[in-house]
Amino acid sequence: MEEAKGPVKHVLLASFKDGVSPEKIEELIKGYANLVNLIEPMKAFHWGKDVSIENLHQGYTHIFESTFESKEAVAEYIAHPAHVEFATIFLGSLDKVLVIDYKPTSVSL
């Protein structure tokens, strides 16, 4: 299959450290969501908590998904001063993190 054209999804799976309060987590999520207003290449942001009954989460409790127009836009986002500043605070609050960038691909049958 050839690489899909179109947007890139930047997905971050996270588990917060035990000492991070629910209020602090809410503040961090709002800060993450606000990056879409500060960094032009970031087109959309969604997040959620694990609700699976399969118990395959490997300790990850939260998922964050950002949408970009290209891989180059993701690189621009990562280097942006607002992201660098936020990431320092955000990552310092996490026990575990996993990041994957992918292009949504449809399968023709």
Swiss-Prot record:
Binding-site residues, Mg(2+): V36, I39, E40, M42
Matches recorded under SMART domains: Dabb (SM00886)
Report the induction information.
By salicylic acid (SA) and jasmonic acid (JA).
Q: Which GO terms describe its molecular function?
A: metal ion binding
Tell me yes or no: is Metal-binding among this UniProt entry's keywords: yes
Example of a GO cellular component annotation carried by this entry: plasma membrane
Q: Which UniProt keyword terms apply here?
A: Magnesium, Metal-binding, Plant defense
Please name the GO terms of the biological process aspect recorded for this protein, alphabetically: defense response to bacterium; defense response to fungus
Pfam families, per the entry: Dabb (PF07876)
Q: Which domain of life is it from?
A: Eukaryota
UniProt xrefs under PROSITE patterns: S_R_A_B_BARREL
Presence of the UniProt keyword Metal-binding in the record: yes
**Stress-response A/B barrel domain location, by residue?**
8-102
Q: Which cofactor does it need?
A: Mg(2+)
Its assembly, as annotated, is:
Homodimer.
What biological function has been recorded for the protein in this entry? Heat stable protein involved in defense against fungal pathogens. Possesses antifungal activity against diverse pathogenic fungi. Possesses antimicrobial activity. Possesses ribonuclease activity.
Query: What is the name attached to this protein's record?
Result: Stress-response A/B barrel domain-containing protein HS1
**Annotated organism of origin:** Arabidopsis thaliana
